[in-house]
């Protein structure tokens, strides 16, 4: 590495440090009604059944798919 490398890198990163970081101004209202335990349980169960169960079945039967000709 040359002696000028740190100076060149400092010059490149110095302009990036001065750029402002834009943040999104996202605000929301409080929920109209609070979710109960049963609502959360039904939501998590439906996500499990719809997404994780079929993918788990395919992964467990992967060897049978490979053996077919």
Swiss-Prot record:
The chain crosses the membrane at residues 37-60. Residues 61-69 are mitochondrial intermembrane. Residues 26-36 are mitochondrial matrix. Keywords: Membrane, Mitochondrion, Mitochondrion inner membrane, Transit peptide, Transmembrane, Transmembrane helix, Ubl conjugation. A motif (SIFI-degron) lies at residues 2-19. InterPro entries: Cyt_c_oxidase_su8 (IPR003205), Cyt_c_oxidase_su8_sf (IPR036548). It holds the Pfam family COX8. It is found in: Mitochondrion inner membrane. SUPFAM superfamilies: Mitochondrial cytochrome c oxidase subunit VIIIb (aka IX). It comes from the Eukaryota. It is a single-pass membrane protein. Pathway: Energy metabolism; oxidative phosphorylation. Coiled coil: none annotated. One of its GO terms (biological process) is mitochondrial electron transport, cytochrome c to oxygen. Residues 1-25 form a transit peptide. CDD domains: Cyt_c_Oxidase_VIII. In response to mitochondrial stress, the precursor protein is ubiquitinated by the SIFI complex in the cytoplasm before mitochondrial import, leading to its degradation. Within the SIFI complex, UBR4 initiates ubiquitin chain that are further elongated or branched by KCMF1. GO terms for cellular component: mitochondrial inner membrane; respiratory chain complex IV. Component of the cytochrome c oxidase (complex IV, CIV), a multisubunit enzyme composed of 14 subunits. The complex is composed of a catalytic core of 3 subunits MT-CO1, MT-CO2 and MT-CO3, encoded in the mitochondrial DNA, and 11 supernumerary subunits COX4I, COX5A, COX5B, COX6A, COX6B, COX6C, COX7A, COX7B, COX7C, COX8 and NDUFA4, which are encoded in the nuclear genome. PANTHER family: CYTOCHROME C OXIDASE POLYPEPTIDE VIII, CYTOCHROME C OXIDASE SUBUNIT 8A, MITOCHONDRIAL. Component of the cytochrome c oxidase, the last enzyme in the mitochondrial electron transport chain which drives oxidative phosphorylation. The respiratory chain contains 3 multisubunit complexes succinate dehydrogenase (complex II, CII), ubiquinol-cytochrome c oxidoreductase (cytochrome b-c1 complex, complex III, CIII) and cytochrome c oxidase (complex IV, CIV), that cooperate to transfer electrons derived from NADH and succinate to molecular oxygen, creating an electrochemical gradient over the inner membrane that drives transmembrane transport and the ATP synthase. This is Cytochrome c oxidase subunit 8A, mitochondrial.
């Amino acid at each position: 590495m040359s002696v000028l490398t740190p100076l060149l890198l400092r010059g490149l990163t110095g302009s990036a440090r001065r750029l402002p970081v834009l943040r999104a101004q996202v605000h929301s209202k409080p929920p109209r009604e609070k979710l109960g335990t049963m609502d959360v349980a039904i939501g998590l169960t439906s996500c499990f059944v719809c997404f994780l169960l079929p993918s788990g079945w395919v992964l467990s039967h992967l060897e049978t798919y490979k053996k077919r000709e």
